[in-house]
Amino acid sequence: MKESDSVEKRKVSMISLGCAKNLVDAEVMLGYLPQDRFEITTDEAQADIIIVNTCGFISDAKEESVETLLEAIEYKKSGNCTLLVVTGCLSQRYAEDMAKELPEVDILLGTGDVPRILELIEAHDRGEDVRQSVGLPQYLYDHTTPRVASSPFYSTYVKIAEGCNNLCSYCIIPQLRGPLRSRSIASVVAEVERLVAAGAQEVNLIAQDITAFGADRHDGASLEGLLRELVKISELRWLRLLYAYPDGISDELIELVATEEKICSYFDVPLQHIDDRVLARMNRRVGEDTIRDLIHRMRQRIPDLTLRTSFIVGFPGETDAEFAKLLAFVEEGHFDRVGVFRYSREEDTPAASLPDQVPEGVKKSRYNKLMKAQQRVSFRRNRALIGRVEPVLVEGYSEETELLLSGRSIRQAPDVDGQVYITAGQADVGQIVPLRITDSSEYDLIGEIVDESDE
């Protein structure tokens, strides 16, 4: 018998908060823990080690992270947990404060310390003081990095770059994640090939700004060049682009999305506002004319485009007139999906010191008005799809009822864009099938699987 066979494995529970980019970090971190010594569990009460991968982007995310940490501390007091590890953006930002305020936390890691997880657990086991182990955010994983999938086998995320050079005045991310660091095209292709071979039908490319991919490498790498290589992977079905900065969307990229069948006709382009004065204070590199021209070029070349964006309401100095302009812009109906954020005053950002901070009550009112306006737009755009046949990725039985299958159309990104409820027909989980849309709501679609032999 091997020595490792006689040692009881330690159970590890990973709680990952925030965005998909954070989820990839969590999967990589778990990959660094040898399977012959550690066993992953989703039951925190049974876990010997709990790792909380925090988000510290805005106030709501920080509050969720703190609440989750307090719950994990309770497991350490009353459950099996003997080691509590905190990593991610919140610990990168507030390691010193957290070390003082949360003595129950054994190890604090930053966003750049992912590959040190095993080293630090072993150091803690030896009695070394490794509570504050937050380093500079310089890490970047590649195709050789071990990774434990937590997403369904048929859909996955691939982080093509880390960090950001955009320096928007409201955003703390460059301080938490560091400057732009792009992977090589060969590395991304190798990872996607492996994931597709393991059954992935949908690959979602992510970064803080995917359009900046390659700008730091000085080897000619670009998002367009990467996509040309990825579409050569024969078994890949859907390739989705998430988080594209508007001034990085070239005509060449639009043409690729328009003509390459494997690239979803879907763009997620955070615009943040439409008023030039607000955009300038946000330190965005685009104005209203550029935004409108971009939307026109995208819609003209990709008639079937699904366009998602996000806006910030209540930015410092945003007047009633500036908000009214944003509201009218949304009501024009350009977008299939919109995420709205109330401005969060983040310390150590230029916007935090701007005059004319907007009261929380006004932010909330503007948020509600903008969301309601987009709900009406989304409802109309979804109703226009009734009668069409669309490809749908089947994800399993609905959370609402086991009588219905559910999935996502090619128009719906994971986690943020609603679902398709399948009222007739059968398919396997992970299968992409044609579906005729029979009904819709603001966010979801309803339809029946089409027998292709009858078409």
From Swiss-Prot:
Keywords, ordered alphabetically: 4Fe-4S, Cytoplasm, Iron, Iron-sulfur, Metal-binding, S-adenosyl-L-methionine, Transferase
Record flagged with keyword 4Fe-4S: yes
Classification via InterPro entries: Elp3/MiaA/NifB-like_rSAM, Methylthiotransferase, Methylthiotransferase_CS, Methylthiotransferase_N, Methylthiotransferase_N_sf, NA-bd_OB-fold, Ribosomal_uS12_MeSTrfase_RimO, rSAM
Residue positions binding [4Fe-4S] cluster 2: C164, C168, C171
Disulfide bonds: none
Cofactor note: Binds 2 [4Fe-4S] clusters. One cluster is coordinated with 3 cysteines and an exchangeable S-adenosyl-L-methionine.
Boundaries of every TRAM domain copy: 383-451
Location of the Radical SAM core domain: 150-380
Subcellular location, record wording: Cytoplasm
Superkingdom field: Bacteria
Cofactor list: [4Fe-4S] cluster
Catalytic activity field: L-aspartate(89)-[ribosomal protein uS12]-hydrogen + (sulfur carrier)-SH + AH2 + 2 S-adenosyl-L-methionine = 3-methylsulfanyl-L-aspartate(89)-[ribosomal protein uS12]-hydrogen + (sulfur carrier)-H + 5'-deoxyadenosine + L-methionine + A + S-adenosyl-L-homocysteine + 2 H(+)
GO molecular function: 4 iron, 4 sulfur cluster binding; aspartic acid methylthiotransferase activity; metal ion binding; protein methylthiotransferase activity
Residues reported to bind [4Fe-4S] cluster 1: C19, C55, C89
EC numbers, comma separated: 2.8.4.4
GO biological process, one term: tRNA modification
Gene3D superfamilies for this protein: Methylthiotransferase, N-terminal domain, Nucleic acid-binding proteins, tm_1862 like domain
Family the UniProt entry places it in: Belongs to the methylthiotransferase family. RimO subfamily.
Function: Catalyzes the methylthiolation of an aspartic acid residue of ribosomal protein uS12.
This protein's name: Ribosomal protein uS12 methylthiotransferase RimO
Organism: Syntrophotalea carbinolica (strain DSM 2380 / NBRC 103641 / GraBd1) (Pelobacter carbinolicus)
